[in-house]
């Protein structure tokens, strides 16, 4: 969204979807990869132009390094996880269930986004769409409020529905849920 705004794109932020810096991670098989400097020259896979990409760049910057100091390979999260499992990359940029699985498998956490990225996911439309379809915008906001209320009033049931839908163990869903702030409110810290 920052790039869109910088290029004068027609963007209207409606609200927030989530904030979850802890859920975005870099994982390795090699336990010695514990600092940005230890990543120099290593092959690191993950999706470009994402929060995970921002995490990698921010982490490297803490040691005055850039993405040019590593062998970065643009891959989806599932491809990155498979490449890490197969040993063809040194580090995978993972989030959500893939990060949880890597942790369970004993992969070494290099870093997560805490203190490095805000990991803000916003809900946005074009200004043109916003102005042309106020009824759809209202339905979306109403549905979001209804979902948030359901989760707040029926947390165990909501987590079980999520576990069933995603074919995950309920304990995994509970652990991941704790990493997220699903408040739709746009806070001052969300503004750039």
Show where each model-derived region lies.
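Short, catalytically relevant binding-site loops at active-site mouths
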Residues: 98-99, 116, 129-130
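Short secondary-structure transition/capping segments
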Residues: 6-8, 25-26, 104-107, 122-125, ...
């Amino acid at each position: 969204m920052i790039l869109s705004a910088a290029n004068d794109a027609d963007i209207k932020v409606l609200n927030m979807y989530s904030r979850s810096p802890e859920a975005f991670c870099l994982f390795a098989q090699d336990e010695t990869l514990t600092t940005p400097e230890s990543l120099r020259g290593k092959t690191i896979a993950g999706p470009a132009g994402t929060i995970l990409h921002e995490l990698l760049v921010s982490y490297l910057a803490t040691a005055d390094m850039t993405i040019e100091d590593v062998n970065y390979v643009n891959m989806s999260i599932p491809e990155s996880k498979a490449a890490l499992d197969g040993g063809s990359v040194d580090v995978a940029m993972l989030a959500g269930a893939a990060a949880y699985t890597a942790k369970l498998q004993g992969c070494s956490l290099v870093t997560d986004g805490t203190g490095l990225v805000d990991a803000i996911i916003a809900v946005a439309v074009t200004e043109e769409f916003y102005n042309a379809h106020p009824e759809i915008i209202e339905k979306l906001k109403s549905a979001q409020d209804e979902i948030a209320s359901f989760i707040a009033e029926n947390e165990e049931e909501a987590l079980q529905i999520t576990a069933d839908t995603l074919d995950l163990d309920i304990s995994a869903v509970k652990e991941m849920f704790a990493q997220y702030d699903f408040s739709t409110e746009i806070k001052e810290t969300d503004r750039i």
